[in-house]
Amino acid sequence: MLLTHLNEENQPKMVDIGDKETTERIALASGRISMNKEAYDAIVNHCVKKGPVLQTAIIAGIMGAKKTSELIPMCHSIMLNGVDIDILEEKETCSFKLYARVKTQAKTGVEMEALMSVSIGLLTIYDMVKAIDKSMTISGVMLEHKSGGKSGDYNAKK
């Protein structure tokens, strides 16, 4: 497989997307944070001293998507049309599953923005309740779906 982020001298470069067609691009990513019952209950009962955890995680996830190109060296800076975040409460496992859907009209995809959104949202939850549970785990951060562009659609295997 040809690595497009390397030049003829095997040095890093940013891929030129200037000749690519502008199309609608959508990416959906997800991830989970698991914690002890005390931390989970504090979040769902709105008893965390730092404020509303899930709402803050949503805002952080949106910010994460917008800042992706500043943190990932070969990622293009693109205008986002929208970032939608959903957080599901999973009481049985004392966990939260965060989904981020990112949409644009661009010459490159938004997979990295969706993955960054999930990661930053989950890290924000960790930050806000680490005083209650330092053993929280973030897992399963993955691309669920992407559409648009030359490579077409992708759906993760269930």
Curated annotation (Swiss-Prot):
GO-annotated molecular function: cyclic pyranopterin monophosphate synthase activity
GO process terms (BP): Mo-molybdopterin cofactor biosynthetic process
Catalytic reaction list: (8S)-3',8-cyclo-7,8-dihydroguanosine 5'-triphosphate = cyclic pyranopterin phosphate + diphosphate
Subunit structure: Homohexamer; trimer of dimers.
Tagged with keyword Lyase: yes
HAMAP family on file: MoaC_B
Function: Catalyzes the conversion of (8S)-3',8-cyclo-7,8-dihydroguanosine 5'-triphosphate to cyclic pyranopterin monophosphate (cPMP).
EC number: 4.6.1.17
Keywords: Lyase, Molybdenum cofactor biosynthesis
Protein name: Cyclic pyranopterin monophosphate synthase
Similarity section: Belongs to the MoaC family.
Enzyme active site: 127
Gene: moaC
Chain residues that bind substrate: 74-76, 112-113
Keyword Lipoprotein: no
Pathways involved: Cofactor biosynthesis; molybdopterin biosynthesis
CDD domains: MoaC_PE (cd01420)
InterPro entries registered for this protein in UniProt: MoaC, MoaC_bact/euk, MoaC_sf, MoCo_biosynth_MoaA/MoaC, Mopterin_CF_biosynth-C_dom
NCBIfam families the UniProt entry points to: moaC, PRK09364.1
